[in-house]
Amino acid sequence: MSERDFNTQSPKFKDENANSVISQSDFLGKSLKNNNDDYSDFRGSYLNDKSSFQTPLRNGSYQPKGSLEFTPLLQSSNKNSDKYNGSLGDKGSFDPNSYGLSAISKQATQEALSISQGNDSYDVSKLTDLSKNSEIDHTDGELPANAALTLREQEKVLEKVSRENFGLRIKIVCLEKRLESMAPEQIKEAVKDNVELHAERANLQLQLKRTESLLQKSEDKNFKLEEKVDYLSKVNDVEQSQNVKVFTERIRFLENALEKVQREKDSLSTEMEEDKSNKEVDYEYEIRQLQNRLDELSEELDVAQDLLTEKEDEIATLKRQIEEKENSSSAFENEENSSYVHLQEDYAILQAKCDEFADRIQVLTADLEKEKENQIMHESEASIGLTDSMQVHTLQEQLHKANEEIEFLHDQISRMNEEGKNFEDIMLQFRSLEEERDVLESKLQTLEDDNNSLRLMTSSLGNQIESLRTQNREIDEEKNHLRLLASKNSDKALAETNIRLQEVTKELETLRMKNSNDLNEIHDLREENEGLTLKIDSITKEKDRLINELEQRIKSYEVNVSELNGTIDEYRNKLKDKEETYNEVMNAFQYKDNDLRRFHESINKLQDREKELTSNLEKKNLVISSLRETVAMLEKERESIKKYLSGNAKDLDNTNLMEILNDKISVLQRQLTDVKDELDVSEEEREEAIVAGQKLSASFELMSNEKQALELKYSSLKNELINAQNLLDRREEELSELSKKLFEERKIRSGSNDDIEKNKEINVLNSELADKLAQIRHLESDKMELDKLVHHLNRGIEEANIEENAVKKRLCLLMGCDYSSVSILQIVSQIEHFVNQQIQTIRSLKQELRHDFVQFSGKKEQELSRSFEKFGLGTETKHDILAQRNRNVSEKMNDLENAAQKFFSSPDRKNGYLYPSEHTSKIEYLEKTIEDLKLALQDELKNRNLLMDDISSYNKQTTKLQEKIKWLERERSILIDELESYRSNQFNYQNNLVQDKNELEERLKEIQKELEVYNNHFMKQAELMTSNVTDESQLMLKTLREALQSKTNNIDHLSTILERNRKEYKSLLDDYNQLRARYKNLQSNTPQSTQSGQYESEIKGLSKLTKYLQSKCRREHSLRLDLAFSKKFILMQLTGYETCNKINLRMLQKIGISPDPDLSKKHIKLKSLIIVVCSIERMKRMKNEWLKQAQLKQSLQRAAAKAKTANY
């Protein structure tokens, strides 16, 4: 895994303001300043030792100081520490030259895991909770230069990638299942033949399930909508019936009340004369009753307003449902686009398969040619001692086999052409799917237009509701006015209440009309929903049909793949052998590496042992030398004592001294013997170590040789892989070139005048290809004859170079004569006679081969003539091509025969002896001619392969052009059908517009009639009120005039709606005329810009996208592992520091030294320090972001306020 450095990205806290964060950071900074003097020394002890903070590299070394760190904790601590000489810029960027952390190895990760699992003293959630609310703000899935994601952010990104690449996962699963049952050498072919088809089938099934689920959801939604509509209609009916009943009852009640009031008025007029004192009391009572009745009327108006609000809510819900339907239709379009992309991928895969089959046929032909050459060599070596009849028989069998192989190859080519035809059918169906997609798009546009019309209707309903609200306001004002009048005159109040009741009844009638209109609109919406459901059902049926057709095609391709598996099985064994050898080489490398490590370890141990032994020897030598000196001193003393005793033998005390000295000497001698034994043992061990070292060195040399051999194998395998990759690149380049040629050919094909010339050129190229194929076959036969001659000449060269005696002995053994009685000249004459016989047999064989070849070429000429007739060539060109072919072959055969005759009919060979110098020169001449012929053969073979490729490409081009013509004809028919459907839709739309226009005119007439009635009624009321004209009556007149103005405004609004409808009708007519002109242009000008390059660009884009996604997944996986390990490593270091401090304190306590309690209390832990520093830095960074967010909120609030004021 590559080593990378990262910068932290500050998380965004949700429930905090910028001012609160600033206050927290200030508080933490002050608390740190107060304790800074106490723990500075404690922190410096750790910071001065930079090796303690460095993480180990993968190979055990340390990273240089210039690299950036990759964890949020250490980076923030380094930024706030003065010991690292780091500097933060204006944007808070860290100076990497101050200090950095290096990458981390796998062993360190395992140690960190073991330590973190064993130690529960540190809670990881305290650190990870800081990054919970971090957001991912990256573009195009790539990380910025100075950012590092947390684990949860990485998980979110991975979830997005997994959702986007669900199809890739399915392909991977299918590949793994298939690879378990296949040989490793057939992986590429299997992936391209079977696995991708299964994956695409799974994708199609998933798409089916999704579409079915969407359809079920849409059906459920439609069913719910229908239920809601039914329920609303029932509710409206019930409410209308209830409202009618309530209003009728109220009207009757009010009429009865009015009658009662009038009766009471008559009674009051009689009673006024009798009892004037009670009149005022009765008046007040009646006024109160009238006020109560007015309150009841106001309550009824409130109920009507509530009903209006409920209907507005229902209209809003219907609008939402319409928008949801639009969203569902957009989702359906996206699914259709995805299916379209998958079909394009199918097309690219099948095209790649065709190219692979063509390459495979070329490889098989090359292998067959090589096998033929090897067979010819073996048969020529074996046929030296055989008879002429056996040679003829074997040559005939070889020719028969070669013909069978050629026929087999032709059959394979025909199969490939059939597969290409199937592929063409798939392309036609694919284009039909595109056409259906366009039709669906047009249908969706019509639906959008219908939705727009519904929106306009809803807007008109909203305007009507607003007008009703204004009327309600006017009614409220009139009620207030009535209350004022009731306080002054009861008679006037009664008259006004009567008038107002009549107006209320009229308004109730208008409300009923509006309710009926709303019900009609609901009915229309229900019909539209039913139409949408029918359209969705038709679309699902079409999709099911297409899916069934695709499944049938997939089954047919599976059958073809099963037939091709027979050819694939032959190559599996080769791949298995190569992979086994590769695995053996890699295992051997591993074993050898382990043995080398062990060997180095044993050598190091032996060297250490040798050093120990040498040190022991030196020590023992020093001891021996010291002991020898002491022994010499003691012997001298002994001799001196003996001399002294010999002089004074009578002294008994001296005898005791002698015994003591003898004991000392015996002890020293024993020590000497022990030292000598130890030296002998050490020397033996040293010799054994030397022998073991020699054995190990020998084994090391063997291992190094084996390692070199394995490295050579590994390099050879690596070169083979590189060659395979180069071949793939070449194939891709050839594909791109072919695609360019196809695009050019399509452009050229679009012109009608250039078609005849291009057909002629294609015919000429086909004739040339046929000639070259015939020449190649003749050259193959010539090659076989030349191989035979080369073999004989090489044998003669070998015999000429051998010494005369060896030649004589071998010739005598071959001829069956004695070595002493026969001379060299006689043996040479016999050999020449045998060679002449062989030449005659070769000539007879050549004649037979020519006869057979003439028959075979006759058949081929017939086939060529048929091909010429297909392409429209004449007989003259055919005879010219065949004559040139025969001339070339005859010239090459004559050259070979002349060279052989010159060699065998030389004057020296006639005399019976051939000098070695002349012999070598002639042989060199023949070798040169043979090499020239070989080069010519190779050139012809290359030209043949190129011509075969050109033939296949031209055949493909012709088929594609024919398909294109068919597709254009179909497209034309589809456009005609669309025009007809559009005309029918336009006619229906015109009829609908006319009906709407008539309805609006009728409605205008009705409104005008109502206005006339209202004006008449108003005039009558004015005549009645002229007798009692007061200030209050003038106010009433003003209110009535305002009501008239509102009605006139409504009339103006309806007239504007009519004008809008007329304008829309004109715009639709203009669009219809434009479409008609466009259709005429399409008929006159055929589509020159085809979508030929589109498929290739899309295929390339998809391949690049898959590679990018694979690299992205790998990169994210590596990032996740590195981040997890870095966190665990930091935790390990922190726990290590804590444990070290605890151990040191315990040691000091055991010794008896205890630190001051003040110091221990004021010391701050490294863990808490890091957390505080991180929080301060993050809050500082978040300050600017929160300020920006606050500014944005303020600007949005201002914009909303402006919008509200503009609406009002």
Swiss-Prot record:
Keywords, comma-separated and alphabetical: Calmodulin-binding, Coiled coil, Cytoplasm, Cytoskeleton, Nucleus, Phosphoprotein
User: Which residue ranges are recorded for the region named Disordered?
Assistant: 1-91
| Compositional bias annotation for Basic and acidic residues | 1-17
Record's keyword annotation contains Zinc = no
Fetch the InterPro entries from UniProt.
Answer: Cnn_1N (IPR012943), PACT_domain (IPR019528)
Question: Out of the domains of life, which is the source?
Answer: Eukaryota
- One Pfam match, by short name? Cnn_1N
Chief localization class?
nucleus
Single GO molecular-function term?
A: spindle pole body anchor activity
Q: Which residues carry this modification: Phosphoserine?
A: 906
Entry annotated with the keyword Kinase: no
What GO cellular component is one of the record's annotations?
new mitotic spindle pole body
Entry's Gene Ontology BP terms: mitotic spindle formation (spindle phase one)
Q: Where is the composition biased (Polar residues)?
A: 48-64
* Location of the protein in the cell: Nucleus; Cytoplasm, Cytoskeleton, Microtubule organizing center, Spindle pole body
PANTHER family per record: CILIA AND FLAGELLA-ASSOCIATED PROTEIN 58-RELATED, TRANS-GOLGI NETWORK-LOCALIZED SYP41-INTERACTING PROTEIN 1
- The name of this protein is Spindle pole body protein pcp1
Q: Species name for this entry?
A: Schizosaccharomyces pombe (strain 972 / ATCC 24843)
